[in-house]
């Protein structure tokens, strides 16, 4: 009798566990179904098609340093998909007559909006020293990070004093003309960069200055003009 009652008790307990666990299991399956589809082989999947030098140049940059845990190619990171999003559907088989699903891309001629492109970048770079992108003049004018920066080259031209000005002059045509004047700062000669005076990420609203004001910025180089003067 005791054995029969015990067996019935276990049966009731088992049914209760199944009833409780069923919604949790269904919920877990639903969550799993909603997870983005990442490629199984990571960057190796991408390079089956994207094997040109312009793409493979990423391995000469800080974005692809396996020893750096914060790098997209660091241990346990998502490699290409850290920036370009889940590529499982994009890399999968495409039926005849269908277009390959797009993934986030960083250029002016893509379906990815400028705001979405920048959102991907600031997920990692928002903590950089002196970074105040949101609400800056460049942000307000829908300038993309990729509009200035080149991520797949060993030396990003906008980060080099000798080549930075040409990147800036693509948009700032008036400043290009001013740089030709005989009394201009030696920007064209590569002796100083635009960022010597300006902060493109928007620290100071006034003309994107590197200093707290026009004078403070100038005094970094022209300390002899700081004063005080005899007849002030």
What name fits each language-model region?
Residues 1-7:
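N-terminal secretory signal peptides that target proteins for export/translocation
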Residues 11-22:
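Bacterial N-terminal signal peptides
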Residues 25-232:
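Short sequence/structural segments immediately N-terminal
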């Amino acid at each position: 009798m005791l054995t029969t009652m015990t067996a019935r008790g276990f049966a009731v307990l088992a049914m209760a566990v199944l009833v409780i666990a069923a919604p949790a299991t269904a919920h877990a399956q639903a969550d799993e179904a909603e997870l983005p589809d990442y490629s199984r082989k990571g960057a190796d999947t991408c390079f089956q098609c994207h094997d040109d030098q312009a793409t493979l140049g990423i391995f000469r940059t800080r974005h692809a340093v396996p020893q750096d845990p914060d790098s997209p190619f660091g241990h346990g990171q998502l490699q290409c998909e850290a920036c370009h999003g889940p590529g499982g559907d994009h890399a999968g088989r495409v039926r005849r007559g269908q277009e390959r699903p797009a993934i986030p891309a960083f250029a002016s001629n893509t379906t990815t909006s400028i705001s979405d492109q920048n959102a991907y970048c600031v997920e990692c770079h928002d903590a950089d020293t002196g970074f105040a992108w949101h609400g800056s003049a460049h942000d307000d004018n829908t300038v993309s990070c990729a509009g200035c920066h080149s991520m797949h080259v060993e030396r990003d031209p906008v980060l080099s004093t000798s080549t930075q000005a040409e990147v800036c002059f693509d948009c700032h045509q008036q400043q290009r003309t001013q740089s030709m004047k005989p009394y201009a700062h030696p920007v064209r000669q590569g002796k100083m960069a635009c960022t010597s005076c300006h902060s493109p990420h928007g620290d100071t609203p006034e003309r994107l200055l590197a200093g707290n004001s026009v004078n403070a910025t100038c005094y970094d180089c022209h300390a002899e003009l700081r004063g005080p003067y005899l007849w002030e």
